[in-house]
Amino acid sequence: MREVIMGYQGEMSLKGLNRNQFESAMMKILRYRLKTVGKFRVYCTQSTFYMEPEEEDIDMDLAFDRVKTVFGLAALSRAVVCEKDFNTICQTAEDYLGDSLHGIRTFKVEARRADKSFPMTSPELMRELGAYLLGKHNYLKVDVHNPDFKVIVEVRDYGAYIHGPKIPGEGGLPVGTSGRALNMLSGGIDSPVAAYRMAKRGLGLDHIHFASPPYTSERAKLKVKALAQLITPYTGSTNLFVVPYTKPQEYIRDNAPDVLFTVLMRRSMMRIANVIAKKQGCEALVTGESLAQVTSQTVKALQCTDAAQDLPILRPLIGMDKTEIIETSRHINTFETSILPYEDCCTIFTPPHPKIRPELDEILEAEAGMPGLAQLEAEAAENAERIRIRITDDVDFVG
């Protein structure tokens, strides 16, 4: 009895002539995720990815955990493969899934015969295998509409694959197939969720964080690093750029109108992010902004922010409310870390009554009165610290 992991395509199967490129990217990602677990053969046929261990004693629980968060898979199964012989299929189904049939009342057999050379039709295989399992578990009843458990048999080119119910995958597209962007990782709830949602659309990501010591602490920086690590099961390995932002932030505080401070700071950050993004080959910036969530996220304020640089700014949370964002943060296991009470440079020096609808003309006028800001921004970008975040790294931060 040989166990395998099966991953089923979703949106990828609709890609037409480009489909091979997406499948190749997916197989590369799956191989990378599995290489620290053991040696696997990874291939794709009939819209399904197969991950077959080529070594003995591989931890299949760990292997499944490594691939279940890969974007591009609509569903996954842990299956066993056996010879395409009816008696062998029956015995293998009982050996592999028999324990799962204890303690339930109803079940159903589903069969798919992709290999038409198999002598039984799909309905015949369902009926006969169901009868065999009923003979082994006479307390069970068949319920084809709402069973407690499904036994699924897929007769394919390379054998008969037997498994229980499919487990939903993350869907989306393989990371990297839609380009690369730089995500503004603040340390709050929103920005990790923004990274997750854009990675789901196939976008490869690096992160940028702005630190303002002594106003922000080393613990705050470690918290952001932990967030970057927590989302690597979805984004894959990535880079985190930590920008020393104290001097530009103090300069804006000391030389700009108080009510415009927040928007001016956001524009300054965008300019620095633009420089680093282009050096890394990124084609866009990603933020966790949600419309009207805070005063710097009104349409007017966002318009002023966008005008500071020339890369597209992607805002995947723009129409989400806080409850939806929090639900996603819990799903990706970042919520508890995000709410740890460490300083965020976006909240220091915040004026009590910032302007909600700033005009671009007044923003440009305020920046004209800060001739030294460009040099401080250039120095901050040049001195950014690059931290490599790998998917196998342990999250070692404890709040």
Q: Residues of each region from the PLM?
A:
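RNA-binding accessory domains that recognize and position tRNA/RNA substrates
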Residues: M1-L182, P192-T238, A307, K355-L360, ...
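Active-site adenylate/phosphate-handling loop in enzymes that bind or generate adenylated species
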Residues: A131-L133, K166, G172-S178, Y245, ...
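Structural beta-sheet core signal
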Residues: N183, H207-H209, V242, T287, ...
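Conserved G/P- and acidic residue-centered "switch" motifs that form tight phosphate/ATP-binding loops
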Residues: G188
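A conserved beta-strand->alpha-helix junction
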Residues: A228-D254, Y342-D344
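Small/polar glycine-rich anion-binding or flexible loop at a beta-alpha turn
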Residues: Q293, P341-F349
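A short alpha-helix-loop-beta-strand transition element characteristic
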Residues: N333-P341
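Glycine/aspartate-rich loop-and-adjacent alpha/beta segment that forms the canonical ThDP
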Residues: R357, D361-A378, E382
